[in-house]
Amino acid sequence: MRPTKLILNNFGPFIHEVIDFEQINKEQLFLISGKTGSGKTMLFDGIVYALFGKASTEGRNEGELRSHFADGKSPMSVEYEFKINDKKFKISRQAGFIKEGNTSLTPGKLDVFEFDEESQLYELRESKISSGNGFIKDLLGINAEQFRQLFILPQGEFKKFLVSNSSDKQSILRTLFNSIRFEEMQNLLLNQVKDEKKQIESRYSRIQILWEDIETFENDELIQFKSLNSMQTKDIIKAIPQFELVGQHLNEEYEQLKSEHNDALEAIKRKIEENNKLIESLKELDRNKDKKVQLEKNKDSIEKLKAELRKIIEIKPLSQLYNQRNTKEQKYENTKVKLNSILEELNELNDKLEKFKKEKEILNEQLEDINIKSEYIDKTKQFYSNINKYREAFNEIKQNETYLKENNQKQEENKNLIDKLNNDIAKIDVNNENIDEITQEIFQLTNTFDKKVTLRENKKKYQSLSQKYNETENSIKKTKEQISDLKLQLENIDKSNIDLNDKQTFIQEIQNALHVGDTCPICGNEIESLNEHIKFDEIAKNQNLIKEVNNQLNKKINELTKLETTSDYISNQMSELEINDDEICDINEIEQQLRTKNKEKEKLQIQIKQREKLKSALDKHKDIKHSLQIKHEKLLSLKHQFETLINEFKSYTNYDETNKFEQCFKQYEQIVTDYVSKSEVLEKEINQTKQQIEIETNNLNNNKLAIKELEQEISGHSDEINQEMKRIGLNSYKDVEILLSKLENKEQIEMKIQQYEHDHQKLTLEIERLSKLTKDNKSESVEKLEATKTEIESNYNKYVEASATIQYQVQKNKDKFNSIMDHINYLEKELKEQQEIFELSEVLSGKNSKKLTLENYVLIYYLERIIHQANIRLERMSGERYQLKRRESISHGYSGLEIEVFDFHSNKSRHISSLSGGETFQASLALALGLSEVVQQESGGITLESMFIDEGFGTLDQETLETALDTLVKLKTSGRMVGIISHVSELKQRIPLILEVTSNQYQSHTRFKWN
């Protein structure tokens, strides 16, 4: 990611500030300079806030970023533009705030834009805070904490990671590399193992419960097996067949006893049943004999009923004749009454028919007028049905005339406009070839002019650079002379005995211990004199002078290096500039020609646009002409249609108005309808009346004939009755009626006789059957048989219950054995499958030779990668003296993340706190850069085209500072834009580009400047 623009509104000390990072050349190192509190770090806060809504350091609350001098009604906002993966994006984030005078919070906003190459505009991608934050995180592939480590190294953050303990490093590395997922994996596996162990223990518990509930059938051997523990699964499996065998033997034994007693019980039940049947048959035989004696006592009365029944049967034919004559006589009387009623009905119908005929004659007198009206209706019916069409024709034909006049007028006006436009177009004599010729001339002139302008600017720039180059060369010459003077001065200083500085006390001690004539312990010669011949004050003075001259010399060498770098840079720029004085002499003339040609082109373009406008208007009016002609044809066609309809209407209806015709048609139609309705009703009434007369006349004749036939039948029945009475011996109709009254009781008499004979026969047959059944058979004592049955049944039930209990116990044992075997099989399979998981869980939770958890192992891997990257720079910065290494230690928890330093001079490891301030800075910077590179690799390979460092360089000496700067310069040359915040003056001299932050105590401003 490479920033291109940052706009801060009401943000910290910036009320409205625009920082254009495109002023920085690619791969450029620049310095951010300003007084303390001017807002340098706020630039980093602005970038981080735009991307993540947070400050650049954890200790700073984003709510404190709003400017104290901001307008109470204006929000704090940041607009940040940047490039990533050859794409441009813009993020606009506005913080929520309470407007002045309001009590409610105005919510924040977030808009994310992407630059579209085709339209050359930023297009909105997200406009909600939650979705926008997700879009940014997906785009960058990192979170805020990782961004701080990758792009921004804030104040105090360098040393924090270096000197922190394992626990603190674990927290930082966990966030950067999301290693919490390994702890979650470890906990997930641990919980899975715990759950699995619980399930295994639960299964052993269920096996124990099932085993303890197994039935032993009071068998001593089985009772002994019950003492087995659920963990002894192999012994349990061996014992199960013994339980099954004992249960099977008991079940077979009780089944045999149950079968024997069941046969005995069935036999006694059959015997009791047969004895009960015999006793009941003897009793039934006695009862039937008594019933037969009682029944035969009614024999005489039955004989009398039989004699009476014979007489009743003989009178039956007479009864039928008698009833037939009575029926005919009743029918005869009814027919006479009906005949009189028919005669009255016929008289009424004839009167009604005459009345209808007179009404018909009156109605027929209107027939001629009705026919005329009916013909008119038939002839004009289609006009009445389509009356709206003809009414519309009468109304529209007048409007049509108006439209035709208007259309003719518009056609004439449009024709005049078309003629005028054609004349105007003909007056404009210009074509595209003229435009193309002038455009080509303008193009050539523009290229020539641009080239001459560039040459003119190059000349000015060359003159400026030449002046600056001469000044720089003079400074180089002067500085070299100063360096030569300093070197000469350094050579002239007396360096004899310079190494004896600070050795005065040591020499005096030696002098006090020796005497003249002694042998020298150093050279071995005889001591001739112990006088003091070394001038220690002069040696110290020379030592200080050498140091002072060396400092001045180093400073001048640095100045010379910077001046030579600047001189080379200016020289390269001068050599790249193209200069030609001959080419720029006529630039004003070319510029004037270009203006003239542009004006000519504009004039021609205006004429072409005017002609195109006239042509467009002409085409429009031609379209209008065509539409007016089409409309005229349609109006004429409609007029012809309307005239045809009107003439047809007048011809057939004899009316000039539709309303009068409609009124007349309705009146005629109503008259005809009423006539037809009345005529149909009368005709219907006449026909119905005639039909009724015919029906009643036919009924009259039928009834007369029926009366004659009934008189003959009644006379014939009377003769037959007299003959039958004479045969039977009856003298009067009274005797006949007495016998006939008894005829009603015939069925009752027959039923009494039949019932008697049926009962007598039934009793006789039953007595014979029972006599045969009980012959030679003697009943036994019921009480004795029942007692025997009770005893047998009691024994049988006892064995049935015992057998059922045994079967139930055997089946329950079988079910429990199946469950136990299922649990055992599951346990064997599960233990075999889970053994590796159990072992893996213990290894991941730290129960291993290294005593490291999975997450700690992963973090150590990342830390060693970071240290490896850091050592590449630290060895160079420390002159191959120092190298970071991870402290090796074995303990539980997050151990092994401490860092110590290996000193190649002493060939020993040292605690990190033993480093000096400058050395600590070197190690911190190297570690921070190494951390940044590893995080970059792990974050999906996001391209780091920029880095900002907010850290003091004041603790470094001259040589260390140079080494640190070389490291940062190499970062720049590797493709990164590197920005540094520092107050060290040497950096201002070494870094030519400065982003200066100035403050007037109320607000701050920024600007880029070159040294």
Curated annotation (Swiss-Prot):
GO MF, one example: endonuclease activity
Keywords on record: ATP-binding, Coiled coil, DNA recombination, DNA replication, Endonuclease, Exonuclease, Hydrolase, Nuclease, Nucleotide-binding
Sequence positions that bind ATP: G34, K35, T36, G37, S38, G39, K40, T41
GO biological process: DNA recombination; DNA replication; double-strand break repair
Coiled coil: 181-210
N-terminal signal peptide: none
Function noted in UniProt: SbcCD cleaves DNA hairpin structures. These structures can inhibit DNA replication and are intermediates in certain DNA recombination reactions. The complex acts as a 3'->5' double strand exonuclease that can open hairpins. It also has a 5' single-strand endonuclease activity.
Family, as annotated: Belongs to the SMC family. SbcC subfamily.
Subunit structure: Heterodimer of SbcC and SbcD.
Name the record gives this protein: Nuclease SbcCD subunit C
Organism from which the protein derives: Staphylococcus haemolyticus (strain JCSC1435)
